[in-house]
């Protein structure tokens, strides 16, 4: 039952005003870990907004990030002062580079005792967070909290979307000065979708792009997450289908076209040539003469050098932000506007155009299919492509058409996920594309399952990243989230071992090798049912059991990697 937090005077406090305004903006959950500010805020002051206790503040930040990403609405996370805030800061960094509208909140020392680096647990929170946020401020007077929340939301929902931060001195949080709950809050006016820059004359630039398309023989659309945030996916699909233009995506934009669509040319990772032992980037881009980057974001790690294969190309940039990277990407035409507005205009501008001739990538598709069908039984552990193929199979069985989410933590296996994991809806494949935050998997799966409670969520994580944040297995169990987790275990930081071999032609075990962890026992100790699988048959059976269980389930899979360091020439070191 909700109640109004009151000061000793019996009047409502800033804590109530804070939660009330967050709720006005559509925030339904606050993920976090509470400290001594619990004397000022209980988090039951307002109905319709729930506190979700996590074991680590990083989990709180990433869970809010993913819930915000999928819903398109700002979400909130909380930390106590000092080390709580610094723990949360990696979640904040994740949301700034991964582009999610997160409202990060942290307690601060009493307003009369804020002496950073001298007062117990007192750090200059705003100075720490400001460089990696859209907006960072400290509350000075209790009655200003509503305005600060409004400013935080507006900044977070401005492209490129990202986190806003409010530091809350505990005495002001518990103060009633100027707080009047008898007066209704003004309308929140939360943006319906992120707000970007609209350049004067963008329509003329769009028409120039259409003229380039008219001359092109083999164009492609390279689509990033800003296109999804704009609500442009159906329009992009219609445009691509009408003009027969292939669609290539960044990691996080997988699912713009569903698996199996003839125009879905896949997602790009710089590791793909090495993983496949095949000239994948050359196959995807060499014949292309026009690249239209639609909602493209350099942070999503599809670098211009990757599409600059083969013949000389013209480029068109369509983005709701001014180009931040002219040194590495200088397009022939730059259209700065809302992505959906551009696609709608472009439909009219190209209405008389005939279908284009798609370039052939069948050799690449055949190579990917060969990996997914790999029937071998390996004595030293399954191969990651076999694991992902099994996950794809059971996801297709368990999910309704166009549904389901595969979450990937960070590691070498993540790039197998980019290549091989199915994604039948926007944000159907989730990973930390911008920040690559180690340990992302568990909190991202929590956020995804909460955003899509009626859809299955599968998580793939390596032993390194998973165990760096495995304490929040208990959070999954406590919330009874039916997440099916697959831990691919080689007792190694496998991606770092790859880089050792690329740079030195050998590995150095003390820097990458771990002692063994019994992840089945670890899961069970946290209240999660678990098993171990060593081959396809066992893994498929375990995945099907997990998908039908209706509660959390973990599968540990011993794996090994086969790689030739010389095949990873597309990587920048």
Swiss-Prot record:
Keyword Lipoprotein listed: no
Cofactor note: Binds 1 Mg(2+) ion per subunit.
Catalytic activity: D-glyceraldehyde 3-phosphate + L-arginine = N(2)-(2-carboxyethyl)-L-arginine + phosphate + H(+)
GO biological process terms on file: isoleucine biosynthetic process; L-valine biosynthetic process
Residues that, per the record, bind thiamine diphosphate: 410-413, 436-438, 464-465, 490-495, 561
InterPro entries per the UniProt record, alphabetical: DHS-like_NAD/FAD-binding_dom (IPR029035), THDP-binding (IPR029061), Thiamin_PyroP_enz_cen_dom (IPR012000), Thiamin_PyroP_enz_TPP-bd_dom (IPR012001), TPP-bd_CS (IPR000399), TPP_enz (IPR045229), TPP_enzyme_TPP-bd (IPR011766)
Keyword Transmembrane helix included in the entry's annotation: no
Superkingdom per UniProt: Bacteria
EC identifiers of the protein: 2.5.1.66
GO molecular function, one term: magnesium ion binding
CC cofactor: Mg(2+); thiamine diphosphate
Alphabetically ordered keywords of this record: Magnesium, Metal-binding, Thiamine pyrophosphate, Transferase
Coiled coil: none
Subunit-structure text: Homotetramer; dimer of dimers.
Entries under PANTHER family matching the protein: ACETOLACTATE SYNTHASE, THIAMINE PYROPHOSPHATE ENZYMES
Function according to Swiss-Prot or TrEMBL: Involved in the biosynthesis of the beta-lactamase inhibitor, clavulanic acid. Catalyzes the thiamine diphosphate (ThDP) dependent condensation of D-glyceraldehyde-3-phosphate (D-G3P) with L-arginine to yield the beta-amino acid, N2-(2-carboxyethyl)arginine (CEA) via a beta-elimination resulting in the formation of an enol which undergoes a second elimination to generate the alpha,beta-unsaturated acryloyl-ThDP.
Name of the featured protein: N(2)-(2-carboxyethyl)arginine synthase
Organism per entry: Streptomyces clavuligerus
Gene name for this UniProt entry: ceaS
